[in-house]
């Protein structure tokens, strides 16, 4: 089962896909901005192994995309655009390959990490083999969630985009993430971009330490910076992200 929520109005739909370790709750600011514009509907989904979506025995970008393709077909969405953050951009590009029989019209990728040094890959693989870790308090779990999801420490604890990042059960608190999802790290970004059959627009927060503008422009010459933003531009400047989506829609 893939957890999702949807809303908004308009003849076109934006499929909002979060990054590794996060949940669909990070899209709340963008959802509000879309609601105010009133031109695009939205559907925000938890990727497999995250939030309220089912855990699987293994994970890959293709497997995550296949689950979302099934959701799109079940919801009879028709033509849609993908807005993906970090890992979500990878999954969006896979969906745009025409391998899944759905009608993606364009992909907006925000802050995808396109270069994976050997040390980063090794760290991700080690995380993927670890058992679920339990915490005594929700605050401890929240601190860990901020780190693994890339949300950082400069977001107030009560903010809605931190919602559903942890789960309370009999043994205490744990992250709402299957550790095995870290196995998706290091997928071939260039191959995914090349496989896309629709327009692709890439962007990053100008302060994002995970990817440079030069790296993005190696894959998409029109890639751009979002001024003043860091890795989580969809939270820091949702209006800019919606503006980029509208620019992409106008190109199609």
Protein language model regions, located:
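Alpha/beta-hydrolase fold catalytic core
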Residues: 1-15, 32, 36-41, 75-78, ...
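Active-site loop/oxyanion-hole signature of alpha/beta-hydrolase fold enzymes
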Residues: 2, 31, 38-83, 243
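Active-site glycine-rich loops that stabilize anionic/oxyanionic intermediates
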Residues: 19-22, 86
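Serine-hydrolase catalytic-loop signature spanning alpha/beta hydrolases and amidase-signature enzymes
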Residues: 21-29, 42
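Flexible "cap/lid" loop of the alpha/beta hydrolase fold
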Residues: 94-98, 103-136
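Conserved alpha/beta-hydrolase catalytic His-Asp/Glu region
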Residues: 136-189
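Conserved serine/cysteine hydrolase catalytic core
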Residues: 168-219, 225
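Catalytic histidine-centered segment of alpha/beta-hydrolase-like enzymes
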Residues: 229-242
